[in-house]
């Protein structure tokens, strides 16, 4: 699951991004309302955590404009604790409203609750061939066999399956899964792909994760005659 954090306070933004990543989410963080609105409108997110007091556009404006064409769930996370502000946020279309200071465990519980409520809007089980990824139960299976994945492996597989058939450069994978700039001297992406292949491909046919030399990786079903790696 991919989450956008729109928060102008660096300490809070970094804390949220780190915590959500450790909880198994893919988390992007931006520091102003203009960039936040642009990201929300041009990228695909499962949830947006939005502050109210932001440079550029405030959170009210971001949500109001976003709701003109998008139904992405939004959770306000703000120091504004007035009842009128809470009502305003919910009436503008927010799915929840959390006041700072906040308990991170409770915040994650609220995030998961919102995502569960979104099940009616889109499937939470991704299927490619006999590979299944259940986003709600955080469970992967291949030919009915349960595949045990770490949080990073789950996020990596989710990214590959969500963008089935699309060649993903190493830089994109590093940014989306590890929130890091790709360095050609590091093999973190290649090593993670090898581990993931050992779990979902090595003992099964057809092979699903493929290397496109000089470009990156793609998850797709290929014909038996096509090169697999």
Curated annotation (Swiss-Prot):
According to the entry, every stretch annotated as the Response regulatory domain falls at 2-115
Matching SUPFAM superfamilies = CheY-like
Gene3D superfamilies to which the protein is assigned, alphabetical: 3.40.50.2300, 6.10.250.690, Winged helix-like DNA-binding domain superfamily/Winged helix DNA-binding domain
Entry keyword NADP: no
Q: Where the record puts its DNA-binding region(s)?
A: 123-221
Give the matching PROSITE patterns: OMPR_PHOB (PS51755), RESPONSE_REGULATORY (PS50110)
Please list the GO terms describing molecular function: phosphorelay response regulator activity; transcription cis-regulatory region binding
Some GO term, biological process aspect, for this entry: which one? regulation of DNA-templated transcription
Q: Which InterPro entries match?
A: CheY-like_superfamily, CusR-like, OmpR/PhoB-type_DNA-bd, Sig_transdc_resp-reg_receiver, WalR-like, WH-like_DNA-bd_sf
Which residues are modified to 4-aspartylphosphate? 51
What are the alphabetically sorted keywords of the record? Activator, Cadmium, DNA-binding, Phosphoprotein, Transcription, Transcription regulation, Two-component regulatory system, Zinc
GO annotations of cellular component type: cytosol; protein-DNA complex
> How does the record describe the protein's post-translational processing?
Phosphorylated by IrlS.
PANTHER family to which the protein is assigned, alphabetical: REGULATOR OF RPOS, TRANSCRIPTIONAL REGULATORY PROTEIN CUSR-RELATED
What's the stated role of this polypeptide?
Member of the two-component regulatory system IrlR/IrlS. May be involved in invasion of eukaryotic cells and heavy-metal resistance.
* Protein name according to UniProt: Transcriptional activator protein IrlR
């Amino acid at each position: 699951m991919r989450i956008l954090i729109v928060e102008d306070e660096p300490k809070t933004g970094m804390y949220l991004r780190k915590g959500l990543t450790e909880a198994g989410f893919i988390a992007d963080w931006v520091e102003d309302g203009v960039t936040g609105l642009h990201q929300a409108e041009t990228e695909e997110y499962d949830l947006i955590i939005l502050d109210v007091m932001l440079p550029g556009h405030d959170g009210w404006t971001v949500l109001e404009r976003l709701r003109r064409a998008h139904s992405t769930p939004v959770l306000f996370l703000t120091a504004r604790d007035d009842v009128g502000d809470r009502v305003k946020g919910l009436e503008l279309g927010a799915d929840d409203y959390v006041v700072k200071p906040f308990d991170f465990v409770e915040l994650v519980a609220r995030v998961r609750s919102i995502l569960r409520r979104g099940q009616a809007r889109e499937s939470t089980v991704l299927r490619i061939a006999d590979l299944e990824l259940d986003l709600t139960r955080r469970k992967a299976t291949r030919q009915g066999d349960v595949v045990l994945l770490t949080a990073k492996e789950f996020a990596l597989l989710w990214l590959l399956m969500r963008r089935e058939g699309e060649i993903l450069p190493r830089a994109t994978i590093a940014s989306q899964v590890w929130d890091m700039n790709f360095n050609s001297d590091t093999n973190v992406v290649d090593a993670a792909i090898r581990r993931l292949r050992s779990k979902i491909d090595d003992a099964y046919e057809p092979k699903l994760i493929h290397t496109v030399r000089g470009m990156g990786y793609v998850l797709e079903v290929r014909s038996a005659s096509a090169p697999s790696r």
